[in-house]
Amino acid sequence: MGNITTENSSLSCPIDHTIHQTLAPVVYVTVLVVGFPANCLSLYFGYLQIKARNELGVYLCNLTIADLFYICSLPFWLQYVLQHDDWSHGDLSCQVCGILLYENIYISVGFLCCISIDRYLAVAHPFRFHQFRTLKAAVGVSVLIWAKELLTSIYFLNHKEVIEDEDQHRVCFEHYPIQAWQRSINYYRFLVGFLFPICLLLASYQGILRAVRRSHGTQKSRKDQIQRLVLSTVVIFLACFLPYHVLLLVRSLWERNCEFAKSIFNVYHFSLLLTSFNCVADPVLYCFVSETTHRDLARLRGACLAVLTCSRTSRAREAYPLGAPEASGKSGAQGEEPELLTKLHSAFQTPSSLGVGGPSTVGLA
């Protein structure tokens, strides 16, 4: 890349984007292909939790919606890196896509923190704090999280994010070295958006493990399963978010010149790409490991098999010679529709409650 002109001055800071332009398309395509269908299913399972009056579903749905917003911005970022970091859309679209890219991190962290606290209260204090474990309380907390991040987004809308370099490339959300106005918002992001929530999350999961170890009614295999789930959740959370925030803090503290910006560019953008995998990890950890979700998937699979079976039967009957006898005495869709509806109905018959009670797998995630 060439020299980048910032809001305040022209800075000669040519940075080689080759590694970033090679890795980013691979990551973005992977997250698009895997993350979009996974999060669509996750949204459906979260809806089932809400339908069962389980407050966990509110947090899961909001977490999934945030991930889907981010995934919807990936085609624009994919086009951007494939055009050698040249933003071909308007300034406002750059700001919106940048906000979706960065604010998704803190919206996700916020809801992951809420899920961990909710599961801690369910496991360690199942007969207390009911006022905090209701749909109304979950909706109120969700509104606060979205409002906090929307207010933060306004801060970026007041600054120019599309900058033209000496090669007439319009770079988006890239300032090298980091600007003064970015330092304060980065400190806020690190302390309030990451450090405080991760402390709450770690404390909650530690409390869950303590409560599970003290439980005499839980089998050892079940305890081991819970411990593995908690450990994997924490490890994936730290792997996705810790490197980026450490480097964000390093940039904010010490990036004063172009040489430092060039030296940290590749590792910083690699850490930013790691945050993208959170969109894939969320539905896996918080939905697809759930026992209730396994049952829902089995019902969904059964419904799909019912559709395919009826479709194959219909095609086979259509292949009969003219005048051939038919077992049902009916033909076409009229003979198949009742059978299909019956199979779909039986496949989706659910227990009276899909909620998660006590230390179940999804309850701990």
Swiss-Prot record:
The Gene Ontology terms for molecular function here are: G protein-coupled receptor activity
| A cellular component term, taken from the record's GO annotations | plasma membrane
Name where it mostly resides. membrane
- In which compartments does the protein localize? Cell membrane
Phenotype of the disrupted gene, per the record: Mice have grossly normal but display reduced osteoclasts derived from bone marrow cells; a pH-dependent osteoclast survival effect is also detected. However, the overall bone structures of the mice are not affected. In addition melanoma cell tumorigenesis is significantly inhibited. Mice display defects in the response to shear stress, and show impaired acute flow-mediated dilation and chronic flow-mediated outward remodeling in mesenteric arterioles.
**In which tissues is this gene expressed?**
Expressed in the lung, testis, heart, brain, spleen, thymus, brown fat, small intestine, colon, peripheral blood leukocytes, macrophages, stomach, ovary and white fat but not in the liver, kidney, and skeletal muscle. Expression in the prostate is weak but detectable. Specifically expressed in endothelial cells of small-diameter resistance arteries.
Task: Report membrane topology.
Answer: Multi-pass membrane protein
Q: Which residues lie on this side of the membrane: Cytoplasmic?
A: 50-53, 126-133, 215-218, 290-365
Activity modulation comment: Activated by a network of residues that connects an extracellular-facing cavity to Glu-149, a conserved charged residue buried in the transmembrane core of the receptor. Protonation likely drives conformational changes in extracellular loop 2 (ECL2), which stabilizes movement of transmembrane 3 (TM3) and a series of rearrangements that connect the extracellular-facing cavity to Glu-149, a residue only conserved in proton-sensing G-protein coupled receptors.
Q: Site annotated as Proton sensing: where? A: H17, H20, H84, H169, H269
Could you say which residues are annotated as the site Required for activation? E149
Q: Which residues are glycosylated?
A: N3, N8
- State whether keyword Metal-binding applies: no
- Which UniProt keywords are given for this protein, alphabetically ordered? Cell membrane, Disulfide bond, G-protein coupled receptor, Glycoprotein, Membrane, Receptor, Transducer, Transmembrane, Transmembrane helix, Tumor suppressor
Which parts pass through the membrane?
A: 13-49, 54-84, 90-125, 134-160, 177-214, 219-254, 261-289
An example GO BP is: negative regulation of monocyte differentiation
- Record's family? Belongs to the G-protein coupled receptor 1 family.
Q: What is known of its domains?
A: A multitude of proton-sensing residues, which include extracellular histidine residues (His-17, His-20, His-84, His-169 and His-269) or triad of buried acidic residues (Asp-67, Glu-149 and Asp-282), contribute to activation of the G-protein coupled receptor activity and pH sensitivity.
According to its UniProt entry, the function of this protein is described as: Proton-sensing G-protein coupled receptor activated by extracellular pH, which is required to monitor pH changes and generate adaptive reactions. The receptor is almost silent at pH 7.8 but fully activated at pH 6.8. Ligand binding causes a conformation change that triggers signaling via guanine nucleotide-binding proteins (G proteins) and modulates the activity of downstream effectors, such as phospholipase C. GPR68 is mainly coupled to G(q) G proteins and mediates production of diacylglycerol (DAG) and inositol 1,4,5-trisphosphate (IP3).
Q: What is this protein called?
A: G-protein coupled receptor 68
Organism of origin: Mus musculus
